[in-house]
Amino acid sequence: MKHQRVPVMILHSKGTMASWPFSRLWSISDPILFQVTLVATLLATVLGSCGIPPYLDFAFPINELNETRFETGTTLRYTCRPGYRISSRKNFLICDGTDNWKYKEFCVKKRCENPGELLNGQVIVKTDYSFGSEIEFSCSEGYVLIGSANSYCQLQDKGVVWSDPLPQCIIAKCEPPPTISNGRHNGGDEDFYTYGSSVTYSCDRDFSMLGKASISCRVENKTIGVWSPSPPSCKKVICVQPVVKDGKITSGFGPIYTYQQSIVYACNKGFRLEGDSLIHCEADNSWNPPPPTCELNGCLGLPHIPHALWERYDHQTQTEQQVYDIGFVLSYKCHFGYKPETDGPTTVTCQSNLEWSPYIECKEVCCPEPNLNNYGSITLHRRPSTSTHCTYISGDKISYECHSKYMFDALCTKHGTWSPRTPECRPDCKSPPVIAHGQHKVVSKFFTFDHQAVYECDKGYILVGAKELSCTSSGWSPAVPQCKALCLKPEIEYGRLSVEKVRYVEPEIITIQCESGYSVVGSENITCSEDRTWYPEVPKCEWEYPEGCEQVVTGRKLLQCLSRPEEVKLALEVYKLSLEIEILQTNKLKKEAFLLREREKNVTCDFNPE
């Protein structure tokens, strides 16, 4: 196929005409469309074609389309559909040769006018006021809508208008409130009541109101005024006061109750409430919820403890009729002449199984039978009672005689012991033993049983053993004590003791150890002896001269153990100098003493009688 030559075209910016070089017969009213058409025509000779153009919601072709294929560059002019207006001069579609029609939206929806404000209501705009849009109308609380609840922007002639006019919102109205039997309301004789109005009902005497006393005019479904809630009714309601065993009323005292009156119950001490404590009188003359019950929640009465009595609690005496809470503790004590059988608290506790805990029994107090050992006899026995299995019980009194010359009395106490002591006759004892470095004192001049001797030691001695001895059937008891010597702590220069104490007791032994460089002169072990001295005598700690050291002795000892001869020489010179100083000081003291004696010789005593 032979391609045609494309002629040159010149467009005038200010004119509406375009000329071909070989003809002046072409006249173009729309230069832009002409230019686009020309370019599309030129492209069509090179590229492909397009199918039927797409359907547009906002526009349709000006000319009827009879073809199904269009060459590249074909331009189709469109016009806006009803409800739309043109927004661009490029109201056409162009075939781009790739089977696509290219265009930019050139029509927009027309807009309806602002519907205005709705008195006592609201205009709800879903999107905007454009063609096809919807608006809704609603009224404020207490108002009803008269008219359409919505409106649409629709076509009319060549323009767009709202389908429905602006409605009205008028205040809701209710019919007069209903009348009720055996009651009335406080409203007037008005033909109607506006939204928010209320009336209050009251019942005739002896009638109870079932329901709410006041009702109000409300709006139902946003369309009609109704009374809410429903009017009450008046009915004779009588509830009889229920009896709750082991319970009591704390609020709402009757005995006759009407509708919705209430009672509050509580249980007596030791009982547990089962059910609701608050009940109401209902319209059917019954109580709702049902009256509660009081269940036992403690220990009823007191346990029987023989030979015991209960102690007072909160200044009150316990009784068999009382109920005691779980965990409640009661104390008891045994009768006179009785005591707890075992050690432990004399209490009982109310347990969770509503039973009392086990208790310690009270056992009769018995005193032991006197053992006079054939040295005496009981002369009198006075007892408070004979109903006992004991020979001697609490309160018994006896008199007994020992050695046919000593008389004693004894009382059986509540603790099962004799007072002042257990009756006993023992043989007489000889004089208490004599001990070295000590002496004894006796309580009585007769050394009879139970008499005592008290020992004490001389100064510088300490008692070892029992201080007091008693006269028993086997003699003086316990063993005779001893008086042991006390030795003072030895003072040893440069030494230390194995046991450091202020005083040491005969025959205590200590060991002496000397400090480093010193050795023990004497016995290392010394013993505290009976004469309060150390035996052997206390040792000394003396200096031990190391091997290879120089020694100088002149009235005292000086030892220098030095490594170099120069140091040894210096030490000896220092020692020599110290000796010279000591000699000078001694001579000075001697001279001063001589002068003092000379002055004393020259002192005379002058006597002047005047």
Swiss-Prot record:
Keywords of the record: Complement pathway, Disulfide bond, Glycoprotein, Immunity, Innate immunity, Repeat, Secreted, Signal, Sushi
Major location (coarse): secreted
GO biological process, one term: innate immune response
Domain Sushi: 49-109, 110-171, 172-236, 237-296, 297-364, 365-427, 428-485, 486-543
InterPro entries in UniProt: C4bp_oligo, SEZ6_CSMD_C4BPB_Regulators, Sushi/SCR/CCP_sf, Sushi_SCR_CCP_dom
Glycan attachment sites: 66, 221, 525, 602
Signal peptide: 1-48
Protein's UniProt name: C4b-binding protein alpha chain
Natural source organism: Bos taurus
Name of encoding gene: C4BPA
